[in-house]
């Protein structure tokens, strides 16, 4: 199947391209850049071709600066936009990237009307809403990276702390991809044992008491910590994107936490895109999965909804003047 990446010369776009090129389900990978980056884009394709030859992978690689070449794509990944700096609030990006995402969403709807749109551009929850409205697609076919990467980070930190394989950690982060994210600690388990038991007891010699607040802070600030050191996050987002894309192409029906339009499925929250667990299959989102939350988590989730909704409203008011629907 064909997958297109818009913004393929950016650091996340490049890393994502290499991840997806190695996936058997991806038969054609089309990389779209700005015209001024077309030579760099071609260089990426040539370099990637050599790498794939060494791996014995055969995939058709294409590159262009023409958005109409998304034609025939099963999935279009939007990574284009102004990158976030370490000291930049995600909301500061919204007005800059909103217009970019809105324009691409319109063109995707024109040239690839049957495709699924995966939004990566930050702030991803707001940009997912923008892409949804400007594409006119059904919400099942427009969603964002959301809290999938945040959930993976939390799993990773817990696995390292408790010295277990990451697959033994079952946890999830919902809400905003940003400071209003909500780790669902109340329903987290390791090897089938609720995390609160690990936190309160010394199950194995040498274990320190689990510092929940410190762990949550690490997840919230993970992106900023990486950006401050190397300028951008690349590999984490790329592999998380690959998880989502291959889940769809292979019709795996996995439950992943992506940013999707809320329509009352959880606590009656509506008209805002938030990270929640969904079942993903060949046609996109097959349904939102209910979540168990304690009182504090529920309150935090509602706070996240209010914050993201307010940010989204301001961006949509701006875009209504710049790019009327």
Curated annotation (Swiss-Prot):
Its EC number is 1.1.1.299. Keywords: NAD, NADP, Oxidoreductase, Tricarboxylic acid cycle. GO terms for biological process: lactate metabolic process; tricarboxylic acid cycle. NADP(+) binds at residues 7-13, 97, 120-122. Pfam families: Ldh_1_C, Ldh_1_N. Substrate binds at residues 84, 90, 122, 153. One of its GO terms (molecular function) is L-lactate dehydrogenase activity. It is an enzyme of class 1 (oxidoreductase). The keyword NAD applies. InterPro entries: L-lactate/malate_DH, Lactate/malate_DH_C, Lactate/malate_DH_N, Lactate_DH/Glyco_Ohase_4_C, NAD(P)-bd_dom_sf. The active site is at residue 177. The keyword Nucleus does not apply. It catalyses: (S)-malate + NADP(+) = oxaloacetate + NADPH + H(+); (S)-malate + NAD(+) = oxaloacetate + NADH + H(+). Belongs to the LDH/MDH superfamily. Catalyzes the reversible oxidation of malate to oxaloacetate. This is Malate dehydrogenase. It comes from Methanothermobacter thermautotrophicus (strain ATCC 29096 / DSM 1053 / JCM 10044 / NBRC 100330 / Delta H) (Methanobacterium thermoautotrophicum).
